[in-house]
Amino acid sequence: MKFGKYLESQVEANRYVDYKGIRKSLKRFKSEIESLNIHISELKAYNLNNATSKINSKQPSPTTATATTTTIGISSSNGGSNLLRNSISTSKFMNLSQTPLGSSTPMPSDQITAINTSKSILESMEQLKEIQDRLVKSLTDEVSKVNDFYMEREKEAQERFDKLKIQVPLYLKSKEKQRRENEKELNDHDELLSYSESYHYSKKKNKLNNNNNNNNNNNNNNNNTTSPPPLSHDQQHLQQPEIKRINQHHAVLNLTPIKSTPLSPKQQDGSSKKEVKISLLSSPILEEEEEEEEEEDDNIHDQDPEVIEMATVYHYDEDELEEVLSDNCNDNGASDEFNGSVNNNGAGSGGGGNNNSSSELNLTFDIIGSKISKSLKEISTHVVKPTTTFFQPLGDRAKRFMSMGKQKSDEALLKEAFREYYHFLVILKNYQVINYTGFVKIIKKSEKNTGLSIGSQVMSFIESQQFRQSKKIERLTSSIEKIHSELFNNGKIRDARKQLRNSEHVSQQSPTISNFFSGVCAGWTSALLMLIYYFIYTKEFDDFVRFSSIYNVYSAFGLVLLWAFIFGIDCWVWTKSHVHYSFIFELSKNKFNHVKIFQAVTLLSVMWITSIGVYMWQSVSGDDFPFPFVPPEYNPLVLFGAYMLILVCPFNIFQLSVRKWFLNTVFRVLTAPIKSVKFKDFFMGDQLSSLVLMIVQFAQFVCFYTYDVYRPEHSGGCIRYARYFNPFISGLPAYCRLMQCFRRYYDSYDSTTGKGDTVHLRNAVKYSLSIVVVVCSTLDGFFSGDSGWHSPYRLIWVVAGVSNSMYSYWWDLICDWSIVVRPKGQHWNPFKWTLRKRRMYQPTFVYYFAIFSNLGFRTTWTFTKSLPQLTNILPSYKLVVVIGIIEILRRGQWNIFRLENEHLNNCGKFRVTREIPLPYQIRDNEN
């Protein structure tokens, strides 16, 4: 594609160089210059003839010879490029031909004629100079428009960069906070695990000593008055909420006994001690093992006192606690001393008792109690809400499942914002290069066609403009690459540039695999079509099981596949015409294109045809079918199950992102008034409006497999009840679109002016008429009966249908497509319309075809009441499918021109990148 054609395809004149408009101006200037050249050439020829006649009549004087030579020089000029240079020679000729001042001799007539001719030449030269000035002014004005637009975009780029730059420290702060939390959780887990291991080691060792010295331990328990009493099972059960409350706040206690030191008399007095039953913090593993060991032991009172001490501590008064802590609290080497204390205690117990061990044990209780007191004081400063430990994990999992796929992480949002901003900078840089190259080519073409030397004057003006001199885009690009590399690529600029330029990995499928897949599908489909052809045209379809119901189910699937195929053709047209449909639909072009759609349709069509062939074969064969696992009437249900498995498959196969986009969009359509409406939402709502027949047949499919399939074949229960629920199903898409229109009007409402965009209300009228048509059609079906066209309900239905069709047809041409506009200066004339100038498709004939064919498509609803008259051509069940096919074709045509109009609107507002919501909100008091 030539560069000039590329610039002509840029339909916004104030955005890129108006190459097409300048070419038209050059043609106009060229015609004016050519007319001036003809006039000047005639004058030169006339002067040359006069000079020649003078030479023949008399000997020319030096003055006349000079004049003749000058005149010949003028005539020898070729084109307008030398006219300005020859204007000097012409002025010399006039000065030589004028009569000297003070001379009374009248000038001859031929000299007067020469002077008048020279004046005419000078006037032509002035006109030529005026044309040159006009051409230069038109070019400089175009340069100014481009420069003004570039300055606006450059300012926008700086503002977006400032917003992104503010996000960087917030992201680093959040990441550091998350890292600290992870480290804290890891340390807490390791600490609990190490404590649990040491505790159980000492517990098992003491238990072994207890079994060997049972009698000695009982004597020690009776003599040792300072040892704590054991806890009953009920008391331990009451202490569990306190354990959980401490565990929730991560109050991890380092419980280690201190060195063996002699006790003061005040400390040896056990009367000042107050027993407080507080359970120590333990890990879930510790609690499980304690429960298992409690079940094994029949009597907890037979355990060693050091085992019981982990469940009971003693609390001192504040004075006593400070004295104990100041004298004895030393945690260095606590683990080894703890093990030694346990060993010594066990040995003393075996020898008949040890006072040092008892004192050491009491001091251990003191330190444990002091640490628990501090922890409880810290916990008391926070408000603790009791939670259930059994249902909490289930609730967290449910929340994660419900939020799956809805919100991205802060890092993913920030990366996406960086990519979109980098894409914006690349487009802006291309804008600089394209416009500068366009001006250079236009200047060359202007000098070539007009012969005027304007290059130096215009180029000097271009070089002085900001869009040529500014280097801010390069600086912003390098800055964003550096920031991205430091945040996400470990300082590697090359990797950062690769990630920023390629928003996602392009998975290119091997053409061999694609061709093999197409060949297998084509061969398999051909064989099945031959089988279906044999069954149909051998008049054996009367033997098909429940043919009328199964036909409706398979036809519904076929309509969906046809709609997908037509949509793939639309994507192919948009790709060829450079309509940015992937940006409009907010999807990746690598995963959503016509090739992917055709591949999906091929796979689903093969499954559809296979199911039909198996159903026919099984119906005809009966018990002779080689695989009689599923009855023939359940084959559509199996096909539907396979389709649903593909649609909701959670694995990253079958275009997971596109399937999620489709399901999310359909959900947003069904919940229209709740959320704001995007283009993809009301576009999908319009698609569902054209698939009403498929939706109705799907409802019959549900009714068939929940009611009719268990009853005799000709019971017809669903057919009798269909007249009651079909109107609600038929009006559901129109209702969803009506709610979307109201929501869009609500979103456009301005509280300051008290008004909203009324175009959404006018659009709501169209869908209101559709609902009225459904209501009138239902009343006609219930009350008209045998009256037919003489029934007033039938007439009301016709009036509503005609009104809906004409209003929808007008809305398509004027608003949805915008291909018909009023010419400038004639807005008052309601009968004067023309095609809009900005068009993406060629040739222009397709627009006229769309105008007239859309009117025919909009009137296909008349066939629904003409079925008795048309049954001679096609059976009624086939004619209904034909009407559905026509509606899908109309929707495919509507899609092509609707996306074109949206693309042109985006170009007009310079919407080429998405607005990514930033992860961190900035408060007003933050700088």
From Swiss-Prot:
Lineage: Eukaryota, Amoebozoa, Evosea, Eumycetozoa, Dictyostelia
Biased composition (Low complexity): 60-78, 208-224
Bilayer topology term: Multi-pass membrane protein
Recorded family membership: Belongs to the SYG1 (TC 2.A.94) family.
Biased segments, Polar residues type: 257-270
Cellular component, GO, one term: plasma membrane
A GO BP entry: phosphate ion transport
Natural source organism: Dictyostelium discoideum
Record domain SPX: where: 1-460
Name of the featured protein: SPX and EXS domain-containing protein 5
Disordered: region residues: 54-78, 204-239, 257-305, 326-355
Pfam families associated with the record: EXS, SPX
Calcium in keyword set: no
Record PANTHER family: SOLUTE CARRIER FAMILY 53 MEMBER 1, XENOTROPIC AND POLYTROPIC RETROVIRUS RECEPTOR 1-RELATED
Keyword Transmembrane annotated: yes
Transmembrane domains' residue ranges: 516-536, 553-573, 597-617, 636-656, 682-702, 769-789, 845-862, 869-889
